[in-house]
């Protein structure tokens, strides 16, 4: 689950990490009060106004402004709050800014990159760091891979002091900042483990002119499967930042991810769903979604799946690919017919049924009188739907 920067920093504060003081607001009339609270608390005059959306690259899109006066801060809030912010991660449609974070300005000497995540190839948590702070880490990996440092953490013993010290030396941090760096690294590692995060990223990690190490920006992704252990973190969910179709799908207990193509895919099983998307692309078309209706697919599930798929105006055709194991293909076929009638289906529909009662399922579809194209071969089915949408 993605959360906002101000929420991520709230988590870091729980674990005594050094983060700037800030105030979040969702109304422009609260800008003056928020500015005063930040400056009176910190004693400084510089306030950074940051758009709060679930996407990176906010600064490049005009969503981050450094202000030196109260008037400038109010003007920045007025401009950013409510804007449609477009960044490299939002897509061309952008995201509407519904909250802004007014934060204490920091006297920056140098910026670094720091993150904690799971490396599945070695089955361990790793710490990644770089001297190239403030940049997209993917860009650094492509242009200067030698500037990315990695340390693997033994899950049995956790982060060790010597590892933190080693990383400080390899980053070239001044000796006066090592204690501050080790303290922050220990705090964010504790946060990553205890809060069940799947990613914790600080970019930039700031070295101040006073040799303090501070988390300038923070991104945390939380493991949704562990939220039952963290009621306070579950409350951080902001559905206004999520795709409405994905929210609706979660209410139906469907695994749905919206994509940019025009062929809606309905499949049972995540592996088959991935293979279906691949075969659609090989046929020269683009999948509009990932949709796994699960092993217990029934009439209601299929109808809800159709509603989700057709909620995307880009969908020009639907490819249903079902392998009957636990689920019976004839029951799925009945669900497809019922769903097609319920949603008044007007786009081409190709159905591939294999497995338990697949022949009976095909017979049910053939007798329905609906314009449904049944195909047995996977590659042929993908080619058929690609041709039908032109």
From Swiss-Prot:
Pathway(s) per entry: Carbohydrate metabolism; tricarboxylic acid cycle; succinate from succinyl-CoA (ligase route): step 1/1
Protein name according to UniProt: Succinate--CoA ligase [ADP-forming] subunit beta
Residues where Mg(2+) binds: 203, 217
Binding-site residues, ATP: 50, 57-59, 103, 106, 111
Species whose genome carries this gene: Leptospira interrogans serogroup Icterohaemorrhagiae serovar Lai (strain 56601)
NCBIfam families found in the cross-reference section: PRK00696.1, sucCoAbeta
Catalytic activity: succinate + ATP + CoA = succinyl-CoA + ADP + phosphate; GTP + succinate + CoA = succinyl-CoA + GDP + phosphate
Gene Ontology BP term (one): succinyl-CoA metabolic process
One GO CC term, this protein: succinate-CoA ligase complex
Sorted UniProt keywords: ATP-binding, Ligase, Magnesium, Metal-binding, Nucleotide-binding, Tricarboxylic acid cycle
Protein family per UniProt: Belongs to the succinate/malate CoA ligase beta subunit family.
